Design a protein with these regions (language model features):
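Enzymes that bind and transform nitrogen-containing heteroaromatic metabolites
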Residues: 1-136
Length: 136
């Protein structure tokens, strides 16, 4: 599966069970990458994808449901238990730090991923967003 997520520079994803930030340009970029594929999302993320012009499947545990080649977007889930199923990571990073109490729970390099590419673009809420792609 191909797991995508967004986080602050320090790996922070949530604070007090709330997303630390968001940007609709990330959703658009992910939709373009996934093209004709379906993106699995959690109930927590459903509001972000409500008006998306592409297909999503909402699940209480999208990491469990997704198979090889499927896209998954996570915000409030730990990837570590599903790392062996993960073939690619798409990580969107804000150029800022935010208070957080839920962080990305792996180091891609330590889990055997290799950095593939980086792309910077402007968002609606963030001047600079960096998309990193890591592959096995």
């Amino acid at each position: 599966m191909i797991v995508s997520l967004w986080m602050a520079e320090d790996g922070g994803m949530l604070f007090n069970n709330r997303r630390i930030s968001r940007d609709s340009e990330v959703i658009s970029d992910l939709g373009a990458l996934a093209s004709d594929s379906v993106i699995f999302i959690s109930d927590f993320s459903s509001k972000l994808f409500r008006d998306a012009p592409f297909s999503v499947i909402e699940s209480s545990n999208p990491l469990e449901c997704a198979g090889a080649g499927d896209y998954v977007f996570i915000e409030n889930l730990r990837i570590k238990p599903y790392i062996e199923k993960t073939e690619k990571l798409i990580i969107y990073k804000w150029g800022d730090k935010y208070p957080s109490d839920f962080k990305f729970d792996i180091s891609p390099e330590k889990e055997g991923f290799k950095f593939c590419e980086s792309y910077e673009f402007s968002g609606k809420a963030h001047e600079k967003i960096t998309r990193e792609i890591w592959v096995r």
